[in-house]
Amino acid sequence: PRVGRQRAERLFSSFLAAQPTYEVVELLVGAGLAAKLAAGVADTLGPDAARRLRDDPWALLSLSGVALVDADRLAIAVLTGADRQDTRRGRAIVGLTLRTATRAGHTVLPADLVVAALQAEGISDPVTAIVAAVESGDVLEHEPPEPEDDEGEPDPALRTLSLARYGMAEELVAEAIARLMATAERIADPASVRSV
């Protein structure tokens, strides 16, 4: 069948637009992973997804439904001398742990639980992994609340971590509630309000 000029240009444009996805497919298939992940990777990581995966194969974990073993397989395929102690791997495990907790309804996790998850995945220096995740801007570290008495120091065991987007949202909500509480006027005497 004959293809008109306009249709040929559309087909060619579509082919060029899909080029980043084809590059990702090449990486994934080379690592023995399903090619069907490529569209999601390209959507999540953008037009330079293949380069980003070559630089940090554990970025694959930013997609839902991808397991650590898949990202490790990709790392072995694209990195010479891939190492389980790589800080990029540790940073990705921190993010994966927090995303998993978020799906279960926990937007903030105690740092001790994140350390335990890192150790369970064989990360020998979990503190470095957490620092890398915080420095990347994807994770927020929340300081423990100040103790009621002036003499006590905050308990470092109460440090928590969250994904940045949820941590910032919760902080904004908390600030708004504090502002409302500070400016609100009482509309009824507490004694006149019946308990529920």
Regions found by a protein language model. Give the residues of each.
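ASCE P-loop NTPase motor cores of helicases and related translocases
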Residues: 120, 124-127, 148-196
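Accessory alpha-helical DNA-binding modules that contact the DNA backbone or grooves
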Residues: 1-159
